[in-house]
A protein has these predicted regions:
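N-terminal module of bacterial RNA polymerase sigma factors
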Residues: 1-32, 39, 127, 154
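Internal acidic/polar
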Residues: 2-7, 93-119
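Sigma70-family region 2
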Residues: 14, 39-42, 53-70, 90-91
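Short helix-coil-helix linker/hinge
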Residues: 16, 116, 126-134
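Structural recognition of an alpha-helix C-terminal capping motif at a helix-to-coil junction
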Residues: 35, 49-56, 69-81
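Residues within helix-turn-helix
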Residues: 45, 148
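Arg/Lys-rich amphipathic alpha helix in sigma70-family domain 2
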Residues: 64-66, 77-97
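A short pre-motif secondary-structure segment
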Residues: 136-140
Length: 154
């Protein structure tokens, strides 16, 4: 556990400093959580919405964190579950799976998309995976998580 993580845990454990601790927690992990979510839900706007919901859920359930795992693992689990819930809702609302045309439109409109041909092929292949498999793939190969950590998150 890093010094920052220790400080966050110390602040979160005291009612008088819990708000400051959570602000520090958001500062430490928001970018990491954003990119985990972004690789699952694909678009920037959707990722921002899911991340906001994940941190809100973490704040509302802070007293349920039991300190058996790292707080970053707990946050990741919340964010990934929120991402998968978002995709399920989106799929129910559309009534069909996201088709290739929509994926291409998202990629073209994505200001962060690099455009490199190999990266494009890889991104296409990853986007075709079922939600849970895509999540496992991104956590393992983009986040370098161990399978045991991934299984505890999912």
């Amino acid at each position: 556990m890093t010094d920052n993580e220790k400080e966050v845990m110390r602040l979160l454990s005291n009612r008088a400093t819990v708000r400051r601790g959570f602000e520090m927690l958001v500062g430490l992990y928001s970018e990491k959580i954003y990119w985990q979510v972004r690789r699952i839900v694909i678009t920037h706007d959707d990722a921002n919405d899911v991340v906001q919901n994940a941190f809100l859920k973490a704040w509302l359930n802070l007293d349920e964190f039991e300190n058996r795992s790292k707080i970053s693992t707990w946050l990741s689990r919340i964010a990934i579950n929120e991402s998968l819930d978002f995709l399920r809702r989106k799929q129910r609302q559309s009534g069909i799976n996201t088709d290739d045309e929509q994926l291409i439109e998202n990629k073209i409109a994505d200001e962060y998309f690099d455009g490199d041909a190999i990266e494009s092929l890889l991104k296409d292949a990853i986007e075709q995976l079922p939600d849970v498999q895509r999540t496992v793939f991104t956590l393992r190969y983009y986040e370098d998580m161990k399978y045991s950590d991934i299984s505890s998150i999912l």
